[in-house]
Amino acid sequence: TTLFRSLISCLYLSVGAQTPQPIKQFLRKPYMEGASFSLIVKEVNSGETVFAYDTIRQLTPASVMKTVTTATALEILGEDYRFPTTLEYDGSIENGLLKGNLYIKGSGDPSLGSAHFAPDHKRFLQEWISALKKVGIHKIQGAVIADESIFDTEGTSLKWVGEDMGSYYGAGSYGICVFDNLYKLGLQTGAPGTRPKLKGTEPELSGIHFHNYLTTQQVSSDSSFIVGAPFATDRYLYGIVPANREWYPLKGDIPDPTLFLADYLTRQLEHEGITVGESPSCFRILREAGRWQPGKRTEIVTTYSPTLREIVEVTNHVSHNLFADALIKTIGLRYTP
């Protein structure tokens, strides 16, 4: 980082000048052997090129493109923009019984429950439960339904490589996201050459079937993959993990974060003594079954995300793929015909 800052500080010289010493030092580093390097720096207001180095070389921009996405989001949405997630109901409340369904209305917020905003990232759950009790709901006749209809169901691109499907860094972006759309799978590993035991997930996932093809070796870190398609309940585990660990975590993507949140909230409600009569569901499932019924709903409480400025800071600092995908989809909504 220090070298990079020194490099940038030396760039305010004419384009025709010799290559600055910091760049020469950078290019002589062992990790740059065989690598390609290109750089251009422009003055923001005038557009004048301050420094250029091998600018005709074609390079893959990779996550540098996140800066374009986040800058565009700040320009269009504004740095104080916040994503709303609303708890709503239809039907009526009679003597503590909700004669209808409870809805989670999403707006594409990628930061709901995100660990990057700890320690208060799970506070929204208690806020929702408290709000339900405040309006007098102690029993739900219908179901908890997540409404992710603001975005389509293509949370991941069909052009992504197969090994990214199921990985935490390849988590899909949907109208409702939660907990960074990732889970941790705990492993208990034994002697080298053995298969590790699966110790459950955090958060707890319902209905997921893991096919375990992992093996242990005497290594310090894993080289493994969790592979699986969006919405699919099967996940395949491949690769190697360190031997003799009482608990070793692997991270994967929540296959259907929208349905997961409906299920998760249902379990939290029942833990708090608020019973739910029907199984959790979501817009995608109900629409495919021809049972989606749009209609009038009553707002109970709205949870707002951190500011866009804060979300952008996380996006660029940790190179958060999910956040970037959600931002570009949100920008696109502003230009939907």
PLM-predicted stretches and their roles:
Residues 52-72, 76:
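Short active-site loop at a secondary-structure junction
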Residues 6-17:
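Hydrophobic h-region of N-terminal signal peptides that target proteins for export
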Residues 1-3:
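Short, small-residue-biased leader/transition segments that mark boundaries at the very start
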Residues 43-45, 63, 74, 108:
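Short glycine-rich, polar/acidic loop-and-turn segments at beta strand-coil junctions
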Residues 25-27, 76-337:
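Conserved serine DD-peptidase/penicillin-binding transpeptidase domain
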Residues 15-58, 84, 126, 130-136:
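Beta-lactamase-like hydrolase cores
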